[in-house]
Amino acid sequence: MKLIIFTGLALFAIVSLIEAEEESGRGCILLYGECTKATGSCCSNLICDCYRKLKKGVQIARQCFCSEKDVIYKKDI
């Protein structure tokens, strides 16, 4: 019985370590990648630009994308 409990705890510890390593080893978000939920995760040469989505003047959503620093995007009509 003690062996089963010890084995279970050991497996739990191993799985926890693997998950922690995966989270810390995640790469940065590339150009035009969505960064809405992780605004600080763009690669070092990029910034996270956020835009408000409006419908009849009321904000209905917010979307963020990684874009180049010092680049301005304008709407083309």
Swiss-Prot record:
Any one Gene Ontology molecular-function term assigned to this protein's record: toxin activity
Keyword Disulfide bond: yes
Localization of this protein: Secreted
GO cellular component terms, A-Z: extracellular region
Tissue localization of expression: Expressed by the venom gland.
Source organism, top-level taxon: Eukaryota
Signal peptide limits: 1-20
Keywords from the named record: Disulfide bond, Secreted, Signal, Toxin
Post-translational modification comment from the UniProt entry: Contains 4 disulfide bonds.
Propeptide cleavage-removed residue intervals: 21-26
Pfam families xrefs: Toxin_35
Family in the record: Belongs to the neurotoxin 19 (CSTX) family. 10 (U11-Lctx) subfamily.
Protein name, per record: U11-lycotoxin-Ls1b
